[in-house]
Amino acid sequence: MVKSHIGSWLLVLFVATWSDIGFCKKRPKPGGGWNTGGSRYPGQGSPGGNRYPPQGGGGWGQPHGGGWGQPHGGGWGQPHGGGWGQPHGGGGWGQGGGSHGQWGKPSKPKTNMKHVAGAAAAGAVVGGLGGYMLGSAMSRPLIHFGNDYEDRYYRENMYRYPNQVYYKPVDQYSNQNNLVHDCVNITVKQHTVTTTTKGENFTETDMKIMERVVEQMCVTQYQQESEAYYQRGASAILFSPPPVILLISLLILLIVG
């Protein structure tokens, strides 16, 4: 009778310990979600600071020092004081003169991005990118930009934009916003530098559309990685020392009894 009670209490203790470890396991914080207060992406809610995407008098689909699809020191679809990756108002991509200057002046890559993508398996760390991994290839998302011109432009030029994103493990970020912001920056930068070194330039419209497309892909990548991260964590909890010791003790007691 006494052994039966002891076995019952050990079983309760085992379940309680396993549950407590499961709830206490560290996981990335949601950060309030998209556009729901707190530090948000784009812009991280910091007026006057570096905002992403570039804010030049209007947000997505609004005037940007001149309406989208209208002249802005050069019509959309044409170089804007020099194409992307070339002099642009006194500075090229990453050379100042634009909101992307914080990335620093890029050096010419020694390896074509497509070659890197072909050689690296999805989820593998890409050499030379500081621990970033290359995600799986995705179908480019269906996005409406608020006007017929940009919707049509995206349909006709979507092949020019990335179908894979660069990211770091989810446990290195405090919330989804930070991972997505970093993912967009590195992916757009790598794709732009690689493309411009081949003699192709991106217009303002290209950059606006590409940032939106990559952002959506980074969100999808985050969701996939978070799910996999939680599943790995659940498996690790089951075989962590406290539950295993309690389970062995319970089995020994039942066998002896």
From Swiss-Prot:
One of its GO terms (molecular function) is copper ion binding. A lipid is attached at residue 234 (GPI-anchor amidated alanine). Cu(2+) 4 binds at residues 88, 90-91. Sequence repeats lie at residues 54-62, 63-70, 71-78, 79-86, 87-95. Disulfide bonds join 183-218. InterPro entries: Prion, Prion/Doppel_b-ribbon_dom_sf, Prion/Doppel_prot_b-ribbon_dom, Prion_copper_b_octapeptide, Prion_N. It comes from the Eukaryota. Keywords: Amyloid, Cell membrane, Copper, Disulfide bond, Glycoprotein, Golgi apparatus, GPI-anchor, Lipoprotein, Membrane, Metal-binding, Prion, Repeat, Signal, Zinc. Residues 235-257 form a propeptide. Residues 1-24 form the signal peptide. It is found in: Cell membrane; Golgi apparatus. Residues 27-114 are annotated as: Disordered. Gene3D superfamilies: Prion/Doppel protein, beta-ribbon domain. Cu(2+) 3 binds at residues 80-82. Its main location: membrane. GO terms for biological process: protein homooligomerization. Cu(2+) 2 binds at residues 72-74. Residues 25-234 are annotated as: Interaction with GRB2, ERI3 and SYN1. Its primary physiological function is unclear. Has cytoprotective activity against internal or environmental stresses. May play a role in neuronal development and synaptic plasticity. May be required for neuronal myelin sheath maintenance. May play a role in iron uptake and iron homeostasis. Soluble oligomers are toxic to cultured neuroblastoma cells and induce apoptosis (in vitro). Association with GPC1 (via its heparan sulfate chains) targets PRNP to lipid rafts. Also provides Cu(2+) or Zn(2+) for the ascorbate-mediated GPC1 deaminase degradation of its heparan sulfate side chains. PANTHER family: DOPPEL PRION, MAJOR PRION PROTEIN. Monomer and homodimer. Has a tendency to aggregate into amyloid fibrils containing a cross-beta spine, formed by a steric zipper of superposed beta-strands. Soluble oligomers may represent an intermediate stage on the path to fibril formation. Copper binding may promote oligomerization. Interacts with GRB2, APP, ERI3/PRNPIP and SYN1. Mislocalized cytosolically exposed PrP interacts with MGRN1; this interaction alters MGRN1 subcellular location and causes lysosomal enlargement. Interacts with KIAA1191. This is Major prion protein. The gene is PRNP.
